[in-house]
């Protein structure tokens, strides 16, 4: 592999590993009453580490990170080298969704058959319509068979998601994020679009259970709690 190509693979694989490391750290934080926001600040203040890609969440997706990690793993295999860190990076990333879903199961004691959830954000990251390896789609495919309905909203990629999810019958797409609260019990956020930063708390309280599952840890737990809205994040 030429140095230029290996450098590109390595850069993306390193960032993917950084994300998986932080997500695994979030499991420790939850067991020890630590707070990932404070941990991120502490780690990020070290100039050797920096503050980027230190957000606990649902894991990485898109085309570049998964593809480049896989390329390095393939190279290791072909060269007869031991597969270690990169293999764990993928494993942790895959398991992070289950870690998040367990929060929903715990809240509802696994009794989801009559529940309607609103999902905000479908793309793998904000400001794109790219659904490749989007964690939101994996979440929908796992959750849909267990619930009454999923109400879906994304600022720009509803149409593409309709094609991707065409075989799932108990989902409904909305063009307005608040109309997606129709008869909904809870909000699940999968992508941190900027338009989700400023939320109408009165609308949130209209959710049957007034609960938000924040898969990207970008809302303020204390503010939502003061507004009588239950907040469930990752490692906070």
Where would I find each of the regions flagged by the language model?
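Structural/interface elements that position substrates and couple domains in central-metabolism enzymes
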Residues: 1-236
């Amino acid at each position: 592999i030429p140095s230029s190509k290996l450098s590109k693979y390595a850069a993306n694989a390193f960032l993917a590993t950084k994300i998986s490391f932080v997500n695994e750290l979030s499991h420790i934080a939850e067991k020890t009453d630590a707070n990932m926001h404070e941990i991120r600040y502490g780690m990020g203040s070290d100039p050797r580490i920096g503050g980027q890609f230190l957000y606990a969440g649902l894991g990485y997706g898109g085309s570049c990170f998964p593809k480049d990690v896989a390329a390095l793993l393939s190279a290791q295999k072909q060269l007869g080298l031991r597969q270690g860190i990169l293999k764990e990076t993928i494993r942790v990333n895959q398991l992070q969704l289950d870690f998040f879903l367990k929060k929903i199961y715990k809240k509802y004691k696994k009794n989801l058959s009559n529940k309607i959830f609103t999902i905000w954000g479908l793309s793998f990251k904000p400001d794109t319509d790219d659904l490749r390896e989007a964690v939101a789609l994996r979440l929908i495919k796992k959750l849909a068979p267990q619930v009454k309905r999923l109400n879906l909203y994304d600022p720009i990629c509803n149409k593409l998601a309709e094609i991707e999810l065409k075989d799932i019958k108990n989902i409904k797409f909305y063009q307005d994020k608040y109309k997606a609260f129709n008869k909904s019990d809870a909000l699940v956020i999968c992508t941190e679009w900027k338009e989700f930063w400023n939320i109408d708390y009165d609308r949130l309280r209209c959710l049957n259970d007034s609960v938000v599952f924040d898969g990207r840890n970008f809302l303020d737990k204390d503010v939502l709690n003061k507004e009588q809205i239950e907040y469930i994040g990752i490692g906070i």
